[in-house]
């Protein structure tokens, strides 16, 4: 297993543990053909979740972190990026800095989704996603 696969698996396991600690069951596909990593049984409904490894953003180190909201396939000739659709997944989940974060695919429609711990010094609010609003335990309350 290469380091990228190891990081992805670690993120996925943290996401599963996060939902499990909240009292929800998680289901995983038996093969790699599914676009989602886990299905979470929220009791009243199931959600398809794609787990993504987050990292600090280069220009705002320790103030913002982000995930790539696409997937890529690689063969001997090229790497191709693919966008997820609402027919494939419902949410993106990540585990970052000891906390799980969940965002719907509708909201994370770009190539990168960025969370910030606070508003920028310019006090810009439009298009800014404050991390506390996306904690898994808070988002799930709005789903069930």
Where are these regions (language model features)?
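Mixed-charge (Asp/Glu-Lys/Arg
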Residues: 1-34, 40-144
